[in-house]
């Protein structure tokens, strides 16, 4: 069984409903969890953080990111969401900045939590092994929730 399929089985075994998935991203893939399970997702991956405290302008969307070793997501930001991440398997690198200039990468380990503001530039990086990151999208515009197209790629290793 592939690492991706094994991860999906593990997530489902915790009682989560996977509503969509994409294992064909050049950097790895993701699982989208049913939004009605946001609090259960927080209980499992964010130490029970009350999801009501995360709401900025609308709903919350939980996801699992699966990052391949040595792969870099695009240097990017979003117009209609902030994000909160928690590394729950492996370690990963993250670069953050309030401008288009990339800062130095910092390494995050299992259990580390990261809060990204709307518009903050960021890049998630796989290191020596696969990394799993729990992510909650904090939609900032309740009338126009964020989606996979809400991404401004400042730099991308894959020419997207």
Pin down the residues of each PLM region.
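Short, surface-exposed coil-to-beta transition loops
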Residues: 60, 80, 118-120
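Short, surface-exposed beta-strand-loop junctions and turns on beta-sheet-rich folds
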Residues: 81, 93, 100-102, 131, ...
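A short, N-terminal "cap"/entry segment at the start of jelly-roll beta-barrel domains
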Residues: 1-60, 74, 106, 151-160
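Glycine- and acidic-residue-biased ligand/ion/polar-headgroup-sensing regions
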Residues: 69, 79-99
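Short acidic-glycine-tyrosine-enriched beta hairpin
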Residues: 98-119
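Conserved hydrophobic/aromatic beta-strand scaffold that supports enzyme active sites
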Residues: 62-66, 84, 105, 113-115
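Double-stranded beta-helix
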Residues: 123-160
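Short beta-strand His + acidic residue motifs that chelate non-heme Fe in jelly-roll/DSBH
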Residues: 74-76, 85, 94-96, 115-116, ...
């Amino acid at each position: 069984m592939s690492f991706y399929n094994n991860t999906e089985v593990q997530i489902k075994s915790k009682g989560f409903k996977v509503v969509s998935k994409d294992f064909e991203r050049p950097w790895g893939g993701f699982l989208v969890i049913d939004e009605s399970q946001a609090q259960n997702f927080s209980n499992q991956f964010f130490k029970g953080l009350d999801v009501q405290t995360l709401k900025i302008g609308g709903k919350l969307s939980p996801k699992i990111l699966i990052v391949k070793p040595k792969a870099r997501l695009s240097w990017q930001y979003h117009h209609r969401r902030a994000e909160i991440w928690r590394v729950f398997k492996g370690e990963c690198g993250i670069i953050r900045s309030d401008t288009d200039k990339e800062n130095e990468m910092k390494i995050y380990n299992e259990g580390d939590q990261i809060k990204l503001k709307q518009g903050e530039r960021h890049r998630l990086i796989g290191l020596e092994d696969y990394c799993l990151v729990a992510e909650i999208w904090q939609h900032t515009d309740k009338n126009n929730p964020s989606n996979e197209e809400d991404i401004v790629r400042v730099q991308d290793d894959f020419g997207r």
